UniProtKB/Swiss-Prot annotation:
Species per Swiss-Prot/TrEMBL record: Arabidopsis thaliana (Mouse-ear cress)
Catalysis performed (reactions): a sn-glycero-3-phosphodiester + H2O = an alcohol + sn-glycerol 3-phosphate + H(+)
GP-PDE domain location: 38-326
InterPro entries the record matches: GDPD, GP_PDE_dom, PLC-like_Pdiesterase_TIM-brl
Encoding gene (name): GDPD2
Its EC number(s): 3.1.4.46
Hydrolase recorded as keyword: yes
CDD domains, sorted: GDPD_GDE5_like_1_plant
Name under which the protein is recorded: Glycerophosphodiester phosphodiesterase GDPD2
Length: 374
């Protein structure tokens, strides 16, 4: 992707507070970051919405909403993940899709989120002032069908500032910086957008743990150049989808992006890791953290396998179920009768990675690789 060169020194500086270290994050040097143990991270809060799904959990709480974030905060998780875009009047808002849809008099209207002002964006869906009626919020599925965005527990759209102000303070934010896959961005534009986000983070994050991530490799590198407080992860499909930008097509390319940009880690589609488990050791040798996302992360056994493999954390939709299943699988079995002193109660529930032989791990990985082909 060709970008016009702009010296970072020419970019207006952010407040000094942006450059301080945030408590709770082990960020000892530009390419070193570790999460506090194996982390379960709530996807778009308590889980993403799939409107056509027969599984009620996929239509439980409005994704990327304050209600969803605080619902996730009720569980013992370290972070939630959500998507941030910037409106045309420079306000960071939380919304996943590139386009937003509404219906009026039987006609479906489409708008690009970043072409809307903040006030226009907030007109969609339930309104904070209950006496007001917002535009009927619709969503376009991957199959191209436009559906009414119906969930059991709805909530209004929100800004990044509101999330910092209204979500449980101890819950970390994994902020995905959203950009259109089909657009080639000039460096100046990326800098402008990222500064809008960083300004809000600087003003409102306080001591909250924050991780930035992006599928856009130039944006990921730039946010690292513009601040040294918070870790930056590069998101990759790891070959599950092929993009024109080759940097997005493999874990090996993702490692290179991180090393070139001084990033702290990779967030990979989980099937890409299971297909290429050898990349895990390369990632660790490069002093990078590794998180995963994807549908398989809603299966407890697949999450546990990643824990065994040394992956640092998983982004999941079914937060309650995955927390319960992984806790059961990771709890040390009760001690047998023995004249030796009993371990403390805390030791009984200590999470320890089990020991598997290389042959056993290879067999499990081969089995997983075969399963995900179907």
């Amino acid at each position: 992707m060709a970008l016009r060169t702009v010296l970072v020194s020419d970019v207006p500086s952010l407040p000094d507070s942006v450059y301080g270290l945030s408590e709770g994050l082990e960020l000892s040097k530009p390419t070193s970051f570790r999460l506090p143990g194996f982390s379960v991270i709530g996807h778009r809060g308590i889980g993403m919405n799939v409107l056509q799904s027969s599984d009620r959990r996929a239509r439980g709480v409005k994704e990327n909403s304050i209600l969803s974030f605080n619902s996730a905060a009720k569980y013992p998780i370290d972070f939630i993940e959500f998507d941030v875009q910037v409106t045309k009047d420079d306000c960071p808002v939380i919304f996943h899709d590139d386009f937003i849809y509404s219906e009026e008099n039987g006609i479906v209207n489409e708008s690009r989120v970043t072409d809307l002002s903040l006030s226009e964006f907030l007109l969609y869906g339930p309104q904070k002032e209950t006496e007001k009626i917002g535009k009927t919020l619709m969503r376009k599925s991957k199959e191209g069908k436009v559906l009414k965005w119906d969930v059991d527990l709805d909530d209004s759209l929100c800004t990044l500032q509101e999330a910092f102000e209204q979500v449980e303070q101890t819950l970390g934010f994994n902020i995905e910086l959203k950009f259109d896959d089909q657009t080639v961005y000039e460096r100046e534009f990326l800098v402008h957008i990222l500064r809008s986000v960083l300004q809000v983070v600087s003003n409102y994050a306080k001591d909250r743990p924050v991780i930035f991530s992006s599928f856009q490799p130039d944006a990921a590198k730039l946010v690292r150049e513009l601040q040294s407080t918070y870790p930056v992860f590069f998101l990759t499909d790891a070959g599950n989808e092929i993009h024109n930008d080759e940097r997005r097509n493999s874990l090996e390319e993702a490692i290179q992006v991180c090393l070139e940009g001084g990033l702290q880690g990779i967030v990979s589609e989980v099937k890409g890791v299971f297909r290429n488990p050898a990349a895990i050791s390369k990632i660790k040798e490069s002093n990078l953290s590794l998180l995963t996302y994807g549908k398989l992360n809603n299966v407890g056994e697949a999450v546990y396998m990643q824990y065994v493999m040394g992956i640092d954390g998983v982004i999941v939709d079914f937060v309650e179920e995955i927390i319960e299943s992984t806790t059961r699988m990771m709890i040390r079995p009760p001690p047998s009768s023995s004249p030796l002193p009993s371990p403390s109660k805390d030791d009984d529930v200590a999470i320890t990675r089990p020991e598997f032989s290389q042959k056993e791990i290879s067999f499990l990985l081969k089995l997983l690789s075969q399963l995900i082909q179907h």
